[in-house]
């Protein structure tokens, strides 16, 4: 087997303006550690969440296609979930910059899954960017939808949204960056 295709690892080159995020979630010590990356672009981010509602909101905001979690960690979210058996002590070079050990475990679970299913060296991915919701003006997914920031309410398409009006980018990478900023 050369490559395993799953919802989070499928690469649709026709819709290159959209990210295809694969994520991992790890529950420990009353927190939910959440990491996600796009294996096509290498964009990688992670955060620490407090509640399942926060997790669900991050899934919807980032259009997560698949979530990897350790067996027996129950996640009640609306996303495709893949349970894996992973050694929580695995260490990847890409996560050495992360100071929180549980966040590092979460990122390592994701990187290990990518290596195993894609036969791909994870060194081509960017280092994980840690972000915290309380450091930014934060809008829930429902607010973003009602204000039609990235998609219209009529059919969920880009046309008629704020993004469609200000998007004058000439490359797919630029379009993804602008959407990330919004």
Task: Give the positions of each predicted feature.
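Charged catalytic and DNA/RNA-contacting regions of genome-maintenance
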Residues: 1-182
